[in-house]
Amino acid sequence: MASTALSSAFSLLSLPSSSSPAAAAAAAPRSFAVPSRARPRRAVAVVASTATESPKVLELGDAIAGLTLEEARGLVDHLQERLGVSAAAFAPAAVVAAPGAGGAGAAADEAPAEKTEFDVVIEEVPSSARIASIKVVRALTNLALKEAKDLIEGLPKKVKEGVSKDEAEDAKKQLEEVGAKVSIA
């Protein structure tokens, strides 16, 4: 494909310079072959090589690749202990995504986790307390007037999500002071 284009280019360049323009036009090929892309491109595997690839590194890599899963887990545990690092520090999403992956033994060792994130839900607002409740909701959430009004009208709704216990209790206290019925979930 590329050779066809190159040979055409070289044949055009190799025309005799002493000939007249009419002779050059007569000697020039009448058609120019454009390589087609009818054949699919082939993927080429590129092997990454580093300048510091040593036989020791290759031997260690082959030894690690030959480990069973149980041996690999033991190696990881040993390296974590020896180097003082934790896999959870590098992959916090993986730890959260698979909380029961430790097996029955790990579940028995764990203490029940205390809830750290709470939602503040407005259950009911009396009609006499709507305006005051809208003001408090706007102060707590930085919502515009229309959004705060819509939130108060379609109850029950979450006012704050994923907040600390202190912040949830403070929001509940402020809303109850103006007459709203609030729960923390």
Swiss-Prot record:
Pfam family membership, one: Ribosomal_L12_N
GO molecular function: mRNA binding; structural constituent of ribosome
Superkingdom classification of source: Eukaryota
Keyword Ion transport: no
Cellular location(s): Plastid, Chloroplast
InterPro entries in UniProt: Ribosomal_bL12, Ribosomal_bL12_C, Ribosomal_bL12_C/ClpS-like, Ribosomal_bL12_oligo, Ribosomal_bL12_oligo_N_sf
A single BP term in Gene Ontology: translation
Transit peptide as recorded in UniProt: 1-47
One cellular component term from this protein's GO annotations in UniProt: ribosome
UniProt KW Nucleotidyltransferase keyword: no
Record's keyword terms, sorted: Chloroplast, Plastid, Ribonucleoprotein, Ribosomal protein, Transit peptide
Family stated for the protein in its record: Belongs to the bacterial ribosomal protein bL12 family.
Name under which the protein is recorded: Large ribosomal subunit protein bL12c
Gene coding for it: RPL12-2
